[in-house]
């Protein structure tokens, strides 16, 4: 049974409320995104649009976003935002509200102009000096005002706009210090809280780069960073679309099973590397997984009597480390975007690396079916959906949680005759019921997902174990290799 589409109400910008409160790490509450492409009329009961806070950095950005974070229609992004995915907001699925916070400085000086300091040597050309002497202007919310043809640091020439979000904006640049290579440059708003959060993310990216000098572990790597008149700027290699963007533009036609298998293997490989280095991503979702190259071919699906896009190269990179948390850092209570949030986070039982494993299980289901497994925005409903799909929540987790308001005599308190109750009853079924074919490789995929979706994080499969799962036996030697020629460096 195909899930029907429900709209959700946005949640508060967690990037502001959580990560900002800690000195070394932060997390955001990313909420509900509408994944079902059929229904577009407003909901009869309540708004169900998700509030993420991320902005994809895409190379073919065409339309200006009108909201804060990454996607406009139903998904809303987060600070770390989908690094290279497109931010074509007017046709997106999430709605986001512009974060109202404004420093007193920006409230009184809406359009502040500063003279750009010229760091060039005396031998620099007159044209370069003219570029450097242009005034630096911020808009009333602290975004850098920049145009095509502007230069930053006399190194980065802006050649395109990739998107804009709560955190700032992303532009496509030519890096003249590296042979005019294309980069996505993330320009943070000139606001203290965002500047500090960017420094935290830079620290994580530095650690990843230090541990992965040969870039074998499929994480987007920072090639440069600098402070430009109060705007923290981070440069990344320009990649393709994120996996949600591709899914959306393909009318939510699921990825073929071989594609799911290869992407799953790469995800497990990348996240195992992070976990072995005492780092938890905490915000895994399709928007934060990017294709290296999202070129595709159009094929005709005789079974569905329609054309569909098939990506030519399923190599991916993991992005958005704005919420990544080291084991020794403070762990905020709430992490992960709603649809990929594990039960231990909802029940406030504490979390660690298994949090990422649950998120991967949800992502694989979405790749396989084209819609989210847990289409909700509210904790109680989320837990009920988990029980309908995965079975009862273990009693020891119920006894330990402080969220006793959700339970009575060891069971969830839930009105099945309410509109939400009817929705869950009609649209949620045991996990295996979603299997498209009863063949060995499909059975193996669902076995892997079920192990990733264990309620008890202590019983959840580790990523080292997942990489040995029989589902990956069908990979080719080429798909198992992770060679890359990328070598981003400052």
Curated annotation (Swiss-Prot):
Record keywords: ATP-binding, Cytoplasm, Cytoplasmic vesicle, Kinase, Nucleotide-binding, Nucleus, Phosphoprotein, Serine/threonine-protein kinase, Transferase, Tyrosine-protein kinase
Binding site for ATP: 162-170, 186
Enzyme class, first EC level, given as a word: transferase
Basic residues: compositionally biased ranges: 103-116
Protein's cellular compartments: Nucleus; Cytoplasm; Cytoplasmic vesicle, Secretory vesicle, Acrosome
Nucleus found in the keyword field: yes
Active site: 283 (proton acceptor)
BP GO annotations: regulation of RNA splicing
GO cellular component: acrosomal vesicle; nucleus
Protein name (database record): Dual specificity protein kinase CLK3
UniProt organism field: Bos taurus
Taxonomic classification: Eukaryota, Metazoa, Chordata, Craniata, Vertebrata
